[in-house]
């Protein structure tokens, strides 16, 4: 595999960017013309002495906004650890640099739009969880990498990457077209990585957890649900647990993703909007495309549907079960487990019912195992696909339990655990394991829902606590606010970053200028005034109590009625995406 360069210097002049590879013995320089945007290879001596120089950690890519093209670079990185001897990095800071030296050619409206688009890019880049490696392919699992051809092994990181998980793929499209530039760029994944050195029975091993978020049908909690016409599921995450000990390595893969048919749950100011299943689209086509691709990539599928089997979630569970039955594919098994019902009143021990139910299937699927001499001893031929409504809180709890069961078998096979020993009894390792899975839950939740995960007290400690319930309540309130009043901007940011919306240079008519309905400002003002008058009437009593009561009833009724009208027209008041029209299923 042709690895990419590790470190760079960015030399900036008025005419060009010069990106110098600083690896030992390398003199390659990438020159980018700031006017024509042409990219060519040159050498260090061609860099003008007058250039302003600074170190950078890598190139994220380029993107066109209203003011012209921008170069996005990684300016800070933090080492996460080593995977099979290869350094894995977390990108922690970025810079967005304009090719143009001035924005004086823009109108005031264009400059304002450009600022909004820049803030959208920063919104995505500031979402924690971008990772990369310069000499290892983070987009593939160990098992996929072991089943590749010699031709695949010779490809550059950019050419061979699994495009589902390359979050800077759109930004690198121009680099992709020039193979001679591939050593200057690398794929960046989004999700979570934890790498820990652990010890059990005096035996030191590496335990790694990698979650890769798909960039297909990416978005935020209430605006992106279900699947698209290609069968890509919302909030799809591939999670791989890797063990390395004494030259041997093992891997266990699980997936999560939104319920894979056409449904929506648009925010409307209600705490929990009612899900809507499309009545006009043929669900089975997209449903089959989704599982056909999953079977090709992961083998047999066991669906663990954790949604409620009553209330607003019940129709989704029933439709999911019906579609699996209609598909009639022996490679797919469906298991419904009403998480909230089974674990109600703090009965979290009942999760063991689900683990025991799937134990035989998990043993049948196995895991990927390579011994110390490099020979493959076992392959994982099936995957658990877990989901709840958001594929976050309930899903993460179940995935951590299944991963622990696989880990028990792996460590016994590697002779790290003695016969009869349980992972749960290894207090030091259990703390590492639970905290990493809780951190994984928080990362996935922040990226999709805007807050940390719920129920992480159980993941961290193995039991629910009063403090955990309070934190869940706080996070739920923050989610409510963000989902209703800021997620439209977040969705637009993701669509811009991933290329779902393309900005035309000097564009005069962007969707950012869509006018708000008159109700957006008028009704909230009326409600605030009416409520304020109600309070004033209570504090400043009239001549008689009947007069005071009349005023209070009038202004109180006005505020209640106005609030009711606002709730009835809830979708007019939420922050909705403007760049790409999201599907409406109702």
UniProtKB/Swiss-Prot annotation:
Phosphoinositide phosphatase which catalyzes the hydrolysis of phosphatidylinositol 4-phosphate (PtdIns(4)P), phosphatidylinositol 3-phosphate (PtdIns(3)P) and has low activity towards phosphatidylinositol-3,5-bisphosphate (PtdIns(3,5)P2). One of its GO terms (biological process) is phosphatidylinositol dephosphorylation. Its EC number is 3.1.3.64. Residues 121-450 form the SAC domain. One of its GO terms (molecular function) is phosphatidylinositol-4-phosphate phosphatase activity. This is Phosphatidylinositol-3-phosphatase SAC1-B. PROSITE patterns: SAC. Keywords: Endoplasmic reticulum, Golgi apparatus, Hydrolase, Membrane, Transmembrane, Transmembrane helix. PANTHER family: PHOSPHATIDYLINOSITIDE PHOSPHATASE SAC1 (PTHR45662), PHOSPHATIDYLINOSITOL-3-PHOSPHATASE SAC1-B (PTHR45662:SF19). The chain crosses the membrane at residues 520-540, 548-568. It is found in: Endoplasmic reticulum membrane; Golgi apparatus membrane. Residues 541-547 are lumenal. The keyword Zinc-finger does not apply. It is a multi-pass membrane protein. Residues 451-586 are annotated as: Essential for phosphatidylinositol-4-phosphate phosphatase activity. Residues 1-519, 569-586 are cytoplasmic. GO terms for cellular component: endoplasmic reticulum; endoplasmic reticulum membrane; endoplasmic reticulum-plasma membrane contact site; Golgi membrane. It catalyses: a 1,2-diacyl-sn-glycero-3-phospho-(1D-myo-inositol-3-phosphate) + H2O = a 1,2-diacyl-sn-glycero-3-phospho-(1D-myo-inositol) + phosphate; a 1,2-diacyl-sn-glycero-3-phospho-(1D-myo-inositol 4-phosphate) + H2O = a 1,2-diacyl-sn-glycero-3-phospho-(1D-myo-inositol) + phosphate. The gene is sacm1lb. Its main location: endoplasmic reticulum.
